[in-house]
Amino acid sequence: VHGGDNMAMYAWHQIPAVDMLFNTADQNSTQFGNIRAVKELRSIANQFGRVRTLSETYGAAGWELTFEDMKRNGDWEYVLGVNFMNQHLTYMNLTGDRKHDFPQGISYQTPWWKDYRVLNDYFARLSVALSSGEQVNDILILEPTTTTWMYYSPTKSHAQLAKIGESFHNFLSELEDYQVEYDLGAENTIKDFGAVAGNQFVINQRSYSTVVLPPTFENFDKKTFELVQTFLDNGGTIYCFGERPVYIDGKMDTRVAQISAHKNWHATKDVKDLISKIDLSEFLLHDPESVGGDLYHMRRELEDGQIVFLTNFSLTENSKGTFSMDGASVKVMDAFTGEARFHPTQAFEDRVDMSFDLPPAGSELLFVSNNVVPPTPPQPRVQFTEMSTEPSSIERVEPNFLTLDYIDLKVGDEKYEDIYFYTGGLKIWEAHGYPDNPWVSSVQWKSEWVKADTFGVGTGFEAHYPFPVGQGVDLSSLRAVVENPTLWEVQINGTTIKPIPGEWAIDHTWGVFDISSNVVIGENVISIFMRPMSIYAEIEPVYVIGNFDLEPQEQGWKLVPQTALETGSWKKQGLPFYAYDIRYSKKVDGLNGPVKVKLNAWEGTVASIFVNGEKAGIIGWQPYELDISEFVSAEENRIDVYVTGSFKNLLGPHHNVTRRGIVTPWSFKYAPEQQPQGTDYDLLDYGLMEDFDIFVSE
């Protein structure tokens, strides 16, 4: 799908908006890592005085999206120009196919929901800061949009079209590497709102002394060309990369060659050449090639100073260096706590020179004041040493889960054995006159599907979910979790059972059934009977919960006795589907002075830290440590680290996974014809792979 001109549409939005999907960072993708998409949004906001810029964020990233992913991706779009986030998405409930609708889901059902306020408050503060003041850039980059139109065909592709897109992506990426401040210009917007005022190229509320034609820019819209002519004659500066344009409105035109000979038209061979010719003093990064990581910045002008937001998009390298800009003093504004503190700088001739050191996925929000602020005494640098502690005791917080996603099905006179639940659902809907689950394949018009709930006698189906139980399992702990618990008859080994009043698991609308009295050692089956058929009867997995471990079989999994947990992957310790918290606990003698907890090798969406029963904070991103000084006691202390998993392992997808970071409804639709062996399920490693450490001051 090709959009004709995104920026042209943004010009008419009161809150320009973009949708950033997935959890990938390919430079040439249309999502995270695609600088152009967000810079278009921000540029139009600058040019039209729009205070807010909206992004729908995190959709289709999968249930496994971590706090570090969310912070990193959010920081990236905020530093490029977003300042208002609409998180994708909050499910009213997870029943049926809803849980497959481009997850992540953000609500009470999600295992990490209890810790999410930390991130929400962080982005709320960033939203305030980065919608304050104005971003004022002096350089305009013309987009090669009309050039791409020359190569576009609805019936066949042209290699040059992809080449232009890749070239422009790479060009913007290199500008960001050198921290060049610029806006993008859309020729369609220039047609309606462009002008020249003196030696300034104007788009509505913004004016630019420098215009850049990027590589592969081959065509001018007629109005743009006329403005460029006037701009050059009035003293404006054009930098042209590569071959000069040769077309106006898609036709060869010698006038382009004539203006390219103008004294203010400069042929430019590469970005380094451009850097040597333009003024970067507004934000001057020293020695950018040695900074490391993947650094971005945004600078916004206020009446009494400037806001600077720095982010490091890399997950593996620090970004470390120095920059200078106009100002007299600097404060760090902590977007996690709302506190501000003095930032040591070197001031000279109304400019400040400051250093930064951002860990992977790190960020820093600064206020550079025009006024001298008396410095506060620097905090003494604390030297930490690792405590010697006993190994953590480890405990599962919630019951273990088994996801049953293969069924035996009877619908009408047809019987099917060992088929994937979604395949079974298709057969049910087809038998009742639908090509697919109507809640999946279409959008209900008014009450269209609700009114279709008129199935007669003789319709319906029965689905059976088999599972084996080994010797020694704590049968008394076993429960079943079934969606829409009052919709159908539920049986365990032929005995009808009712949901436990007031109990739920995973989602408020899902029922919990006591199966402890009916489960036997050996083969068991949970059955659901739907007679007559209902429009609400979406076949989904059923879950067994309780105190057990799981052992992979040639087909699926077997319940076996629960064993003690150790550090290492949960899925290798009988918890392949477990989504919630595991508690790692240490008891240590009296602590005084600065103390911090540090996680070593670990996998999880987030970790919450408790000291003596009181929540001290969370660990979700590098450097994976937390100061717990104010929570420790001079007497014995109990330190608990709760590592949180995700719904990826519980809800899937478990079979049709082609790439991490992209999860769509189709990811859940396909699976092997018969249930594969347990080890073939696609599951993630969660847990502390190494014990956590406690550091105290020397």
List the predicted regions and their residue ranges.
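C-terminal structured "cap/appendage" subdomains that terminate the fold
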Residues: 198-199, 214, 223-224, 254, ...
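Extended, low-complexity, turn-rich repeat/linker tracts enriched in Gly/Pro/Ser/Thr and Asp/Glu
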Residues: 484-490, 601-608
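A cytosolic small-molecule/anion-sensing beta-strand core signal
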Residues: 611
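A conserved, well-ordered hydrophobic junction motif at loop->secondary-structure transitions
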Residues: 577, 581-585, 595-599
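Carbohydrate-binding surfaces of carbohydrate-active enzymes
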Residues: 1-16, 20-479, 483-485, 490-538, ...
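Glycine/proline-rich low-complexity spacer/linker segments in large multi-domain proteins
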Residues: 372-391, 531-558, 645-696
